[in-house]
């Protein structure tokens, strides 16, 4: 599954979180599941719907869509497309509502699925972490909390390394000393279902920059 948000946005003019658009998004998912069942019967090979974040395609598919359809506001105007059925990364929604919403789509992703909530540094608020984890356990198949763990080797800054635009390109910058050297910046972000410490293509970097907190 890719770009459920963009598909529904183009077809209805609304986010798939809008109550009037959610049934259409779920209908698409069910139609895809029905197709998998049909192919399985035809070929005697198992087919299944997988809610994949698939790291490399978020940028590649965005460029292909722009080339084919041009720039469509709210649909193809970014360097990335939304992972699977997820709420758009820039959409303001709290952690519990996001998990509740996406749980509907996980039930229609029998091949695998994962959801995320973006949180600030929670080391001094473990009660809140436990509350979210309990909600995950009670309400959704699989989900993770994303936090930030960065370090600048040049000045010793221990906090969030920022993404800034420099000469038309997105780069990582230490907010304390201005260091741009990726060799001396330790940046950890969740991408494609795991916490990565390598740097990312421009599309994924734009997506990371656009993420809003859910707590």
List the predicted regions and their residue ranges.
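Long, C-terminal-biased catalytic regions of enzyme "large/alpha" subunits
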Residues: 1-215
